[in-house]
Design a protein with these regions (language model features):
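Post-transcriptional modification and biogenesis factors for structured RNAs
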Residues: 2-251
Length: 251
């Protein structure tokens, strides 16, 4: 692993932005284009791993709720969904998620086909982000998303200016994560309820345009020897911080 040396060292801690982590060469991933209304396949098998996951065909009298999918009831449900959504149609799952989505958004700059986008999208689904925004190139590495993007509202923006205009029109604060002078400390920051986290490319971090368009930036404290953390990891930390401050967490 080769970290980029972008982090800033302070006497007591490292405060960093997501940075570069390279591993051994991997096969070229398949890239897909994203649009504001990306079509969803009705059935989402896992992209890899054991075939026998999930549940088999429904046993006994069939349920009659409109949320159930006849093909899944007959053939079994092998999708990557929580148990409460077994045998539900994709449309029913999305509708149920839409009724209770959280008020944060996630945006990723995609100028170089960033490998972290899939991981960030998967975390956005787990924490129930309202929308995911891809800025720059439309095509992105879907592998890490584990088909969770099918249950998200994924929007594309040509540049950060259009992203900022869209968010500000909805009253959403745009916050970038980067190690910049004046950045808020995530650990002590009173996070807005309606906020979008913007993540830059691995290595260079936020683009100059993004830094100018953001309403502010925040950084994540580090205390070990590495100068950087992976962008996908940083995104998960930011989203979970929102959950801790604003979500209705079961006791």
């Amino acid at each position: 692993m080769i970290p980029n040396s972008k982090g800033l060292v302070t006497p007591r801690e490292y405060r960093c932005s997501p940075d570069l982590n390279l591993s051994s060469p991997q096969p070229a991933p398949s890239l897909v284009a994203v649009t504001a209304e990306e079509p969803r396949a009705p059935y989402d098998p896992m992209p890899h791993g054991p075939a026998e996951v999930g549940v088999g065909p429904w046993e006994g009298a069939l349920p009659t709720g409109v949320e159930y999918d006849a093909q899944l009831l007959a053939e079994g449900d092998r999708r990557n969904v929580v148990d409460r959504y077994r045998y539900w149609s994709m449309e029913a799952i999305v509708a149920d998620l839409d009724a209770r989505r959280h008020d944060f958004h996630v945006a990723i700059e995609n100028w170089q086909h960033d490998f972290n986008i899939g991981t960030i999208v998967r975390s956005a689904n787990a924490f129930l982000a309202r929308e995911v925004h891809i800025v720059g190139r439309k095509r992105w590495n879907r592998r890490g998303a584990m088909v969770t993007d099918r249950y998200q509202h994924v929007r594309h923006h040509e540049d950060v200016e259009s992203l900022a205009a869209y968010l500000h029109g909805k009253g959403v604060t745009l916050m970038g994560i980067d190690n910049l002078p004046g950045s808020e400390h995530l650990e002590t920051w009173a996070m807005p309820r309606s906020v979008c986290f913007l993540f830059g490319q691995e290595g260079p971090g936020l683009s100059e345009d993004a830094r100018e368009r953001c309403d502010g930036t925040f950084s994540i404290a580090q205390f070990g020897s590495t100068r950087s953390i992976n962008a996908g990891v940083a995104a998960g930390i930011a989203m979970h911080t929102w959950i801790r401050q604003h979500a209705d967490v079961p006791r």
